[in-house]
Regions:
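Short, Lys/Arg-enriched N-terminal segments with co-localized hydrophobic residues
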Residues: 1-25
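Conserved catalytic network of the ASCE P-loop NTPase/AAA+ motor domain
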Residues: 49-52, 69, 99-104, 132-137
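Sequence-level detector for tyrosine residue identity
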Residues: 18-20, 66, 82, 159
Length: 161
């Protein structure tokens, strides 16, 4: 409970500083078709967050393409190296990351669909689990999805910023 309380307090303070904290304080989704600038936007958000917070910032991607576009204060993780085969393995990976480092403030996940390897319509449990992890550990999740926002299931669409 104290971490969740601190999380809400931190979010209120950071909301004024961070224009990307509009939609939801726990999970945010950047959705758009391929080539619409999602990765550039999520990288900018991660770099801004690294400057504006004392918490650790983690950026998870499926390969090393954008590693050098990130500030050195951002911890880059190439999840492709961990052979995640499905959404359950992905959630185990996320749970492990948040449980081993209590100083993580935000986790940015690029190429979410490639990492979960599941049809988005079957991932409602993933988003519910991310909410629980966020509430318990005080970590915000920012995801990018290569999908037209109009085609997203309602349980994801509510997080789109």
């Amino acid at each position: 409970e104290p971490r969740a309380k601190a999380h809400r307090k931190r979010n209120a303070a950071n909301k004024a500083k961070n224009p990307y904290k509009e939609a939801c304080p726990l999970i945010q989704v950047i959705a758009g078709k391929k080539g619409s600038g999602k990765t550039k936007r999520i990288i900018e958000m991660a770099n801004t967050a690294a400057k504006d917070t004392k918490h650790d910032i983690v950026f998870i991607d499926d390969d090393n393409r954008y590693m050098f576009d990130l500030s050195r204060e951002v911890r880059f993780v190439n999840a492709g190296e961990y052979e995640l085969e499905n959404d359950q393995m992905f959630m185990g990976f996320i749970s492990g990351a948040t449980s081993q480092n209590f100083d993580i403030g935000q986790i940015f996940i690029d190429a979410f669909k490639k990492l979960v390897k599941a049809d988005l319509s079957t991932t409602e449990w993933v988003f519910k689990r991310l909410e629980k992890i966020s509430e318990k550990s005080g970590v915000d999740f920012i995801l990018s999805l290569s999908e037209d926002p109009a085609d997203l299931p309602e349980f994801i669409a509510k997080y789109v910023i």
